[in-house]
């Protein structure tokens, strides 16, 4: 599914994802600051990283998103590209790789995860987020009658993968990740809106 972007403003989910992103990068000593945003959308996260001193490249399948990014953020490099492409061969590897709220849209999450991990330089980190699912949250959705609105069955091209901590951890480890730390964000942990995996190489 390809989003159509009408502006370069931060998304709703950026409001609860960016604090973890900033905490992670600010608590780290960087000898080099090259960053890659896999699924950069309208470039808002690329711009945030640029404002924190990173040399940023991003790719997205959305033409409108990339056009918004190029028009609004000339100091970052945003281009058309897919998580199924051999991006490391084309762009190289990076000290920081970010992918926020993208993998849940992918028919081939293993291929996407392998691309994500391939972009992380030795000694670098990757930060990947996706909506959180777990027993208590799913039960709460069912009991409050919000399953339909949450799973967005009528959203053309919407979310097609629904990860728990266990399934996302399994996916990343199958694809070669070893050192993974999780954060749950947006609400109290059992009802979290999203989870953020921080992968160290």
Where are these regions (language model features)?
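A short glycine-rich, Lys/Arg-flanked "PGG" loop and its adjoining helix->strand segment in the class I
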Residues: 113-122
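Catalytic P-loop NTPase motifs of RecA-like helicase/translocase cores
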Residues: 106
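Conserved catalytic-core motifs of eukaryotic protein kinase domains, centered on the activation segment
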Residues: 109, 139-140
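Conserved N-terminal segment of class I S-adenosyl-L-methionine
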Residues: 1-92, 96, 100, 109-113, ...
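A structural motif corresponding to the C-terminal end of an alpha-helix
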Residues: 174-177
């Amino acid at each position: 599914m390809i989003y159509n972007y009408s502006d370069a403003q931060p998304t709703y989910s950026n409001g609860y994802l960016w604090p973890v992103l900033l905490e992670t990068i600010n608590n780290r000593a960087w000898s080099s600051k090259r960053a890659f945003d896999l699924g950069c959308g309208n470039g808002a996260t690329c711009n945030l990283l640029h404002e924190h001193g990173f040399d940023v490249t991003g790719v997205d399948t959305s033409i409108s998103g990339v056009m918004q990014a190029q028009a609004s953020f000339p100091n970052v490099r945003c281009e058309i590209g897919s998580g199924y492409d051999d991006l490391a061969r084309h762009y190289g590897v990076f000290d920081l790789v970010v992918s926020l709220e993208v993998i849940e849209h992918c028919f081939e999450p293993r291929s996407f995860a392998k691309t994500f991990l391939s972009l992380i330089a030795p000694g670098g980190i990757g930060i990947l987020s996706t909506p959180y699912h777990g027993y208590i949250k799913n039960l709460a959705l069912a009991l409050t009658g919000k399953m339909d609105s949450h799973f967005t069955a009528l959203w053309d091209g919407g979310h097609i993968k629904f990860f728990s901590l266990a399934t996302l951890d399994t996916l990343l480890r199958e694809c070669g990740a070893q050192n993974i730390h999780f954060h749950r964000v947006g609400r109290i942990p059992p009802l979290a809106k999203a989870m953020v995996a921080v992968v160290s190489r």
